[in-house]
């Protein structure tokens, strides 16, 4: 979606809402009492959720567009709702003033940027963080005030630390690997 589409919707939202069915409105899942929102509940988003949930509990909300994934997450007792992160109407239902952090874990960099711009245009003033796959995206995100984490750069360091630990265990006579 383009920025013009979002502008059009924002200007005409009240008129358009009168055409929503009652069934649609009732289908909206609760998004209240949220401090952290994770957009995209694939591997990265799920990993972030699992890291944050022990501390933040139900104040963490995952957003996923794929129905099957939403159901899988709910079966695992995760608080995940089905929504399109680029849909302004969804964000109007979220109290952005109580949200402290939104984590962009969508697979498409341009969609992450679009959603970040949308959120800022809607008045979101909390923290934005994103996992990125390319170094040039880190700079682009930071230029827009988004904290960027290079997934592959950090993954390599973690992989090396893990391998080094294995090597140390193998060389340690008291290790169970021998």
Q: Residue ranges of each PLM-predicted region?
A:
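Cytosolic regulatory regions of ion transport systems
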Residues: 1-178
């Amino acid at each position: 979606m383009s920025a013009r589409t979002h502008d059009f919707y924002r200007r005409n939202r009240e008129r358009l809402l009168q055409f929503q069915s009652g069934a649609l409105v009732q289908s909206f899942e609760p998004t209240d009492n949220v401090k952290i929102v994770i957009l995209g509940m694939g591997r990265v988003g799920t990993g972030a959720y699992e890291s944050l949930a022990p501390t933040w509990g139900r104040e963490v909300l995952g957003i996923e567009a794929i129905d099957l994934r939403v159901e899988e997450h709910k079966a695992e007792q995760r608080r995940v709702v089905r929504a399109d992160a680029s849909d302004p109407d969804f964000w109007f239902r979220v109290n952005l003033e109580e949200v402290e952090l939104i984590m962009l874990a969508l697979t498409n960099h341009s969609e992450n940027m679009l959603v970040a711009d949308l959120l800022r245009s809607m008045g979101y003033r909390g923290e934005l963080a994103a996992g990125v796959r390319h170094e040039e995206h880190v700079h682009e995100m930071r230029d827009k005030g988004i904290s960027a984490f290079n997934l592959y750069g950090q993954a390599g360091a973690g992989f090396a630390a893990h391998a080094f630990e294995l090597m140390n265990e193998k060389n340690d006579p008291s290790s169970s690997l021998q």
